[in-house]
């Protein structure tokens, strides 16, 4: 070809390498040798947990409100509810009776219906609210009659939920009747009769017999059998001076006996030293120590006996204030 001159080959330079066709053809991709496993979160290193890192907001971001649930309280006592009061009484060795303070009563001088709360104490669960007790009586009876002789009905309600604290929410568990008794010159002796509200079956009664000096109460079961005698010494400061400052700062003991000879006490009902609120009101507190072999029904009657002791010796009505 004209105008084209071939490049002479250099005999000392090897010819370029010639690439042949591939020996094998690429095949299709096979399945992976191992299947992917579940996701494993990173392990804690040096006590640092990346999963507990709180979300970081901007500086000055308001924190969400934190709701703290506190147990209900009464008079500084934290308590819980129970579902079966008789089963709780079967395991309980004692209860605390707290009277609700009536500040309006101190201001007006008019006697108000009494209210009490009964707590069972457990080393594992603390204080357990068992019952709420409220007096139902006429205004004329409260203002004109002494507390140890006036007539009233007391409804003892089992408190299983916070709704049971409402007086009209549920029916009473125990109904206690205290008939009017003219105790002047020991003509009639006061008594309190307890019945189960649901079945109207008698639970028992507590009666205060005539004694010369020392106060005494007799506890009878539903069949009329005398089960316990509750006896107190008249020479106690809290009993002789019950309505003044010295009496409120003293404990009063009423021992529980089984026999007429009062040989060995098996329990006690103790009026506790007044708290700061009880010093300026007529409210009182009682500790009831049950006998070890007492049945739940007998323990219920001992609670009623503690309420009766309050009315007979430590409840100062409006008529008592006028007589002083």
Locate predicted features.
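Low-complexity or membrane-interfacial segments used for flexible interactions
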Residues: 2-17, 22, 32, 37, ...
């Amino acid at each position: 070809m004209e105008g084209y001159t071939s490049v002479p080959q250099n005999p000392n330079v090897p010819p370029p390498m010639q690439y042949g066709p591939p020996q094998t053809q690429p095949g299709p991709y096979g399945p992976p040798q191992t299947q992917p496993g579940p996701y494993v979160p990173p392990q804690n290193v040096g006590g640092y947990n990346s999963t507990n890192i709180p979300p970081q907001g901007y500086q000055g971001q308001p924190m969400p409100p934190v709701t703290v649930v506190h147990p209900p309280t009464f008079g500084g006592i934290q308590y819980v509810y129970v579902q079966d009061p008789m089963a709780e009484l079967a395991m309980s060795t004692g209860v605390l009776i707290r009277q609700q303070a009536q500040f309006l009563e101190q201001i007006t001088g008019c006697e108000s219906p009494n209210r009490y709360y009964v707590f069972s104490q457990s080393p594992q669960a603390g204080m357990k609210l068992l019952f709420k007790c409220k007096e139902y009586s006429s205004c004329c009876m409260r203002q004109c009659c002494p507390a140890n002789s006036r007539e009233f009905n007391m409804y003892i309600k089992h408190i299983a939920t916070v709704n049971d604290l409402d007086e009209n929410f549920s029916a009473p568990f125990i109904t206690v009747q205290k008939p009017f008794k003219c105790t002047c010159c020991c003509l009639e002796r006061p008594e309190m009769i307890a019945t189960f509200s649901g079945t109207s079956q008698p639970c028992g009664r507590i009666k205060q017999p005539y004694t010369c000096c020392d106060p005494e109460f007799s506890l009878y079961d539903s069949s009329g059998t005398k089960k316990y005698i509750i006896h107190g010494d008249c020479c106690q400061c809290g009993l002789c001076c019950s309505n003044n400052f010295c009496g409120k700062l003293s404990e009063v003991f009423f021992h529980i006996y089984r026999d007429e000879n009062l040989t060995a006490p098996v329990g006690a009902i103790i009026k506790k030293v007044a708290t700061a609120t009880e010093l300026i009101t007529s409210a009182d507190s009682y500790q009831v120590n049950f006998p070890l072999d007492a049945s739940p029904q007998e323990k219920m009657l001992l609670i009623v006996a503690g309420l009766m002791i309050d009315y007979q010796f430590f409840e100062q009505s409006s008529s008592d204030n006028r007589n002083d």
